[in-house]
Amino acid sequence: MLLTIDNVLTEEELAAASSLLAESAWVSGLVTAGAQAAKVKNNQQLPEDSPQMAALRGLVLGALNRNALFFTATLPKKIMPPFFNRYSGKTNHYGFHVDNAMRMLPDGVGYVRADVSATLFLSNPQTYDGGELVINDTFGQQSVKLQAGSMVIYPSSSVHQVTPVTHGERIACFMFIQSMVRDPNQRRLLYEMDMALLQLRQNIGETEAVVSLTGTYHNLLRQWAES
């Protein structure tokens, strides 16, 4: 399932993130690339020891914690601390690749299984040319280029790339989510049921049938979720 979520960051949060990123120093994006990805990755990344990293991560995670659509679509069990990357000049693209299934936490203690990948755009699309996130999966090929502050989520098993940025600068935040529901088809069914329940409540209220169907949703989640 591919899903876009608008306005994950408020205007104030986006301005704060932009200010922090403007003060940041960047390093080669190869620091987090696996063996396959290293052959096609050509961008820059904010290093772990960046003075701005903690504030930026706190800002993004705080926004995700209050976003109901992000929760129902990903059902997060663990969220890998977000990373930040930049595409511009000669470091301007990332060829087709698949994200590693297991991601080591930045502190080196433990792993996160990458079930869902997410990109939070931090540059407005009018400010750069190229830089589309192209994703191939069972839903076909999708090209994504969103307004700053908006996010796309998609299965981490998807083959994807960032096309060359030929003018301007593309800055984004990316992260990996381990879901309580590992199977993407089960996760999609739960999302669709939750959205249908939301629409039913708006249309007809908390009827007996809606309450019963809500119980079915939670029983399915109880059956499929990992503790």
Swiss-Prot record:
Does the entry feature the keyword DNA damage, yes or no?
A: no
Provide the alphabetized UniProt keywords.
Dioxygenase, Iron, Metal-binding, Oxidoreductase, Vitamin C
Return the InterPro entries for the record. Oxoglu/Fe-dep_dioxygenase_dom, PKHD_C, PKHD_hydroxylase, Pro_4_hyd_alph, Pro_4_hyd_alph_FE2OG_OXY
Cofactor(s) recorded in Swiss-Prot or TrEMBL? Fe(2+); L-ascorbate
Residue sites binding 2-oxoglutarate per the record: 170
Q: How is the cofactor bound?
A: Binds 1 Fe(2+) ion per subunit.
Reported EC number(s) for this entry are: 1.14.11.-
Tell me the Pfam families matching this sequence. Answer: 2OG-FeII_Oxy_3, PKHD_C
Q: List ligand-binding residues for Fe cation.
A: 97, 99, 160
Which NCBIfam families does UniProt cross-reference here? PRK05467.1-3, PRK05467.1-4
Full protein name: PKHD-type hydroxylase Neut_0373
